[in-house]
Amino acid sequence: MAFQAYHGVTGAQHQTNFNNLSAQGYRMISLSVYGDPHDGRYAAVWVQRAGPAWVAVHGVDSAGYQSFFNNWTAKGFVPVIVSATGAVNNAIFAAVFEQGIGGPWLARHGMTSGPVANANTFQHFVKTAADSKLIVRSVAIYGTASDRRYAAVWHANPRYVKWHVHPSDTGASYQTAFDAETQLPGYSLHAYRPAYVAVSDDQMYCSVFKDDVVGPWVARHGLTSSQYQTEFDAQNAAGFYPICVQGGGSGSNTRYAAIFAKQDVPSSRAWTMTGTAVPTLAALDHVMQSFMQANGVRAAQLAVAKNGVAKFSRAYTWAEPGYRVTQPSDRFLLASCSKMFLEAAVQSLYDAKKLTPATKVYPLLGFSGPADPRSNDITIQQLLDHMGGYDDTPTGSGFDPTYRMRFIAQSLGLSHPVTKLDVARYMYGKPLDFTPGTNNKYSNFGYLLAGAVVEKVTNTTFFNYVKTALLQPAGITEVEVLPTLASGRTNHQAIAEDEGMDKSPIDLASNLLVPAVYGGDGEINEVGDPNDGLAASAHALTQFIHLHAVWGNGPRAAGAARSGSTPGASTLAVSRWDGVDWACVVNTRDWPPSTSPTLDDLFDTSAPISPLSITHVLDTTPIP
C-alpha cells in the first residue's frame, strides 16, 4: 500500500501537503488537529487508491464547520473523519467528507459528557447510534476538563460489527480498558481491536474498539513526537503503516496515539457451509444464511434426525478469511440445553434404584442447620421440576447463584474458586423463595444442586458419570464440558462470542475485567456443567433427545423443546410429534436491534409459525 504520513505540521504545511498528495491520487484515511487552536498542528495519513469523490476542511471554527457541513451534505457528501481541538468557545475543526456513503448516518459536534439519559451528551448519542444499528466511524475529544466536548460520526452497520466506546480515560485507565477489550472473542478467542483512539489536549483518551478484522495490528499511546517517529520507522520496516494517528497537547507536551496495520479496510466476510448437502432440505441452508448474515453471526450448526436416523447435519460460517471453518462435529456452548443431560442422569439413577424422586437433597449431601428449615425438605424431583423453592427471576429473590460464583466465594471467605458444594452451602444459608412443591419457578441453581447429588451418589464428577453411563453406551461422542478459560479451549470448540465483561470467578485476587464467555458472566462452566456449562454439536443433541426427554426426565418427549441462552450461546433442541428431532446451536446471543430475521423467527415453534423459521421448513418439507 502506497501511503504518506506526517505529524506536527502547521495548517499551512498541511494545506500544501493536501494540494500535492490529492493531485497524485492519494486520499486521507486519518486526520488529527491538535494543540493551540490559534496555531493548530496536524497529523495525517494518506493512501494512494481510487475511491469516491471527497472534500476536506481544516482550521475552521464551530460555525465554519457547520457551514461546511450544511453545504456538502446537501450535495450528497457525508463526514467520514472529524477532529477538533481547543475549548468550546474557540475550538477549530478538521474533517473529511465522502460521496456515496450508503445507508443512514449520524454526525454531531459540541456534544457534552454526561449520563446516557441526558440528551445532547456523547454517551446519549453513542447509545442512540448503537440502537439504530450504526457504528462509530470517527470521534474527537476536545474542550477542557471542566467542559469536555466531543465530535463524532456514525455510519450504517449492516454487517453488525460489534463496537464499544470508552469516552474519557487517562493513559493508565485507557491501558486497563485496552487490556480488557482485546481479550474479547470474535474472529479469534481474543479478537477486539482498537479502531480509533482520540486524544485531548490534556491527554484524555476516547477510544473505540471493534470486532472487525484488519489482520495483525500494533497500537501505541502516550508517545512524544520523537517516540512516535521511532515507532513509525520500526513499524514501517516491518510492513505496517499507520491507519489512525491522533495527537493531543502542544509543543513538548504533545502526545500521540497510533494504530499500525497492514490494511486499513476491514476484511469482508465469506459464507461457508460444511457437512453433506441435502438438496431436499436446501431451504434450511437458506434460512440459516439469512439469519446469520442479518445478525453478524460467525458460527452455527443445524441438525435434523428422524426416528433416530440422522437426516441433516450442517455447519455454517459467516466470517473473515482465516477464521476456522465450522464443522458439523464442533462443540458449541449449550447454555440451558445442558440441563437435559442432568435430567437423564438423575433418571438413570432412579432406574438403578440409587435415587428416588422423593430423595431429599440436602440431608443426602450431609448438610444440616439450614437458614430456612424448608430447605431440608427439597427433593431431587422438585429440583428437576423447578419446584425446589428457588426463584432466580426478578419475581423472586432475583439472585441466580450460578452467575455469582465470585461473589459467593468472597462471601464464604474462600481463597479458591467455588465448587458445587460451596454454592450449595451458601444457598443453604439463605431463605427459600417459596415452600418446595408449591410453585414452579425457573431455577438454574436447582440443576447445579441436583448435579451435586449426582456426584455424591456416583462418587465421580457429574460429566464423567454422564459420559460413561449415558453417552458412551449410545455412541454419542460430541459432548463435553466447555472449559471456562480461553487457555483451555480447543479448535473443535466453536468460539463463543459475547460483548460482556466482568471480574473473574476463578482469579479471585484480580480486579481486572475478563470476557463474559471466559468467566466474566460470573459462572465457572466446570462447576455449572449440570445447568449451563456443557458443549455439544447439534448432531449430538439430536442423538441424545431421541433417547432421552428434551424437557423433563424420562424417554423421548414428543412435542417438547428446550432452549438455552447465556453469554456465547443460543441453542434450541426440539422433539416433534412426527418422530423428527432437530437442534440448532449458535455461538452468540448478541443481536443487533430492530433487525429481521430475529432469533425468535429462527427458533419459532408456536403458531403462527414464522416463514423464516426452521419449523416452517420442516412443516412443509417431507422428511423420509
At which residue positions do the language-model features occur?
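Short, surface-exposed loop or secondary-structure junction motifs
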Residues: A371-L572
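Sec-exported extracytoplasmic/periplasmic mature domains
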Residues: A23-Y26, F77, L134, Y187, ...
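Residue-level structural signal for beta-strand termini and adjacent loop
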Residues: Y34, T85, Y142, Y316-T317, ...
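Extracytoplasmic/secreted envelope proteins and their assembly/folding machinery
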Residues: Q15-F18, Q66-F69, F122-V126, Q175, ...
